[in-house]
A protein has these predicted regions:
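Conserved acetyl-CoA-binding loop-helix of GNAT-fold acetyltransferases
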Residues: 90, 95-107
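Short amphipathic alpha-helix that is part of the acyltransferase structural core
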Residues: 1-47
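Residues that form or flank phosphate/diphosphate-binding pockets in enzymes
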Residues: 18, 80, 98
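Short loop/turn microsegments at loop-to-beta-strand junctions
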Residues: 57-58
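Short loop/turn motifs at secondary-structure junctions and domain boundaries
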Residues: 49-54
């Protein structure tokens, strides 16, 4: 039995990739309604991240042994050289300190 966990970070640059749908499931199940950004708006910005005038947008999925277990959304504001972490969401089934801190450090 192999208990090794291999975490990988993958940047989302298109809403057409299969990982996007898994990430949105995790996002909608993990984030409270009042704090949620519309998934249509997230989809738009994933597909048009280069149009963000203030800096750079980043959308990531966390993979554990090639299974999508997390989603993160960040913005880098060039003028103030500030990195904002908007969301870090991890599937409840995989939610642990190991998964969270691995995701955080990979970002």
């Amino acid at each position: 039995m192999n208990n090794n966990v291999d975490y990988k970070l993958m940047r989302l640059t298109s809403s057409k990739c299969s990982e996007y749908f898994e990430a949105m499931k995790i996002y909608t199940q993990s984030v409270e309604y009042i704090q949620k950004t519309s998934t249509n708006e997230i989809k738009y910005w994933i597909d048009h991240f280069k149009k963000f005038a203030l800096g750079d947008l980043f959308f990531f999925v966390l993979l554990s042994n090639d299974i999508v277990i997390g989603y993160a959304e960040l913005a880098y504001i060039k003028k103030s050289r500030t990195l904002l972490i908007d969301y870090i969401a991890i599937d409840k089934q995989y939610n642990s300190n190991s998964a969270f801190y691995s995701f955080y450090w990979l970002i």
